UniProtKB/Swiss-Prot annotation:
Primary role: F(1)F(0) ATP synthase produces ATP from ADP in the presence of a proton or sodium gradient. F-type ATPases consist of two structural domains, F(1) containing the extramembraneous catalytic core and F(0) containing the membrane proton channel, linked together by a central stalk and a peripheral stalk. During catalysis, ATP synthesis in the catalytic domain of F(1) is coupled via a rotary mechanism of the central stalk subunits to proton translocation. Component of the F(0) channel, it forms part of the peripheral stalk, linking F(1) to F(0).
Family: Belongs to the ATPase B chain family.
Segments passing through the bilayer: 27-49
Bilayer topology term: Single-pass membrane protein
CDD domains per record: ATP-synt_Fo_b (cd06503)
Name of protein: ATP synthase subunit b, chloroplastic
Superkingdom of the source species: Eukaryota
């Protein structure tokens, strides 16, 4: 306590204001200087420090608000993306099902058209075979007829005389003429 009262006593023996100098007595001047410096710092620095802290607080709050808004926007975008993904997956499933149905339908159409084509080819083959059989039969008939005719002509030529032959030809021509008149 004596030290405390001694410091006030020293205040009474303050040096005159006329001289300016550097006080080297650290123990005597330090608490007073420190209290004055702290007092000035507290008095003037309090407002500046409050302003700095308020500005920092506002920036932090703004950053938090912006982060919250960005988070809400990101959550909304995520929900929208999930909804679009569900829609795309649903449509992909529809396309997949429709694709399988379309493939089955095309497969059946291809099988049916191939069956029809094979049936037509079978019919064409049968018609061609029938046509070739008829043509071959007609050719055989024609050859048989020509051979029979040539054989008959040969037999007639050997059996008939020229005069008999001419009469037979004239009689046959007459018969053909009569038949022609009847048919006309």
């Amino acid at each position: 306590m004596k030290n405390l009262t001694d410091s006030f006593v020293y205040l009474g023996h303050w040096p005159s204001a006329g001289s300016f100098g550097f006080n080297t007595d650290i123990l005597a001047t330090n608490p007073i200087n420190l209290s004055v410096v702290f007092g000035v710092l507290i008095f003037f620095g309090k407002g500046v420090l409050n302003d700095l802290l308020d500005n920092r607080k506002q920036r932090i709050l703004n950053t938090i608000r912006n982060s919250e808004e960005l988070r809400e926007g990101a959550i909304q975008q995520l929900e929208n993306a999930r909804a679009r993904l569900r829609n795309v997956e649903t449509e992909a499933d529809k396309f997949r099902v429709n694709g399988y149905s379309e493939i089955e339908r095309e497969k059946l159409n291809l099988i049916n058209s191939t069956y029809k084509t094979l049936k037509q080819l079978e019919n064409y083959k049968n018609e061609t075979i029938l046509f070739e059989q008829q043509r071959t039969i007609n050719q055989v008939r024609e050859r048989v007829f020509q051979q029979a005719l040539q054989g008959a002509i040969g037999t007639l030529n050997s059996c008939l005389s020229n005069e008999l032959h001419l009469r037979t030809i004239n009689a046959n021509i007459g018969m053909f003429g009569t038949m022609k008149e009847i048919t006309d």
